[in-house]
Amino acid sequence: IAAIDFGYDHPTAVVWIAWDRDEDIVYVYDCYSMSKQIPSYHGSHINEREGSDWIPIVWPHDGYQHDKGSGITLAEQYRDAYVNMLPFHFENPPALGQKKGGNSVETGLMDMLDRMESGRFKVFNTLYDWFGEYRMYHRKDGKLVKLKDDLMSATRYATLSLRHSTTKGSRWNDKGRLGPDVAVV
């Protein structure tokens, strides 16, 4: 699965992860970050990645923002650029007994921290931009500093969206996951 954090003045960031379901280990294996570019530009770079035709992209609720000129939502602009966006925006996994999850940042951070401390979160050592941002991620007076956190946000979205991950040969459409033996018409 992959996840995007939208930006313009601050970077648009995308993180790709693989999930070993048997061992419950998350591997961050690729990332992309660029500012001051339009969705079609980012889309072409996303689509250069191997698996872009079947790896779903998780996106936050700000993907519903409309372009002032065209009226097209940000998520739709990425779909128009052939990016494999999930048909719904990111939500944290629902708590026990709940039907919907929220957008709490702490939920994702605690999940990532738990994975890091237990050896179930690994990042390829070639992802210099990711590690640069990770080293700067911090709190001040108990609150997260929301600067240069775009790759971390995308990582959080992806890590908490493992339930939407898929394998090669499976796809998503607006009704949900399609298995490898289901034709996309």
Listing of model-derived features with the role each one plays in the protein:
Residues I1-Y8, W59-P60:
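Two-metal-ion RNase H-like nuclease active-site motif
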Residues A3, F131, L147-L151:
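Alpha-helical architecture
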Residues F6-Y8, Y137, Y157:
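Aromatic side chains
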Residues Y8, W19, T159, R163:
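Hydrophobic/aromatic-lined pockets within catalytic cores
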Residues T12-I17, R156:
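Short beta-strand scaffold segments in enzyme catalytic cores
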Residues V15, D22-K146, S165-V185:
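Mg2+-dependent endonuclease catalytic cores in nucleic-acid-processing enzymes, primarily RNase H-like
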Residues D150-S165:
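Stable alpha-helical structural segments in soluble proteins, enriched in small hydrophobic residues
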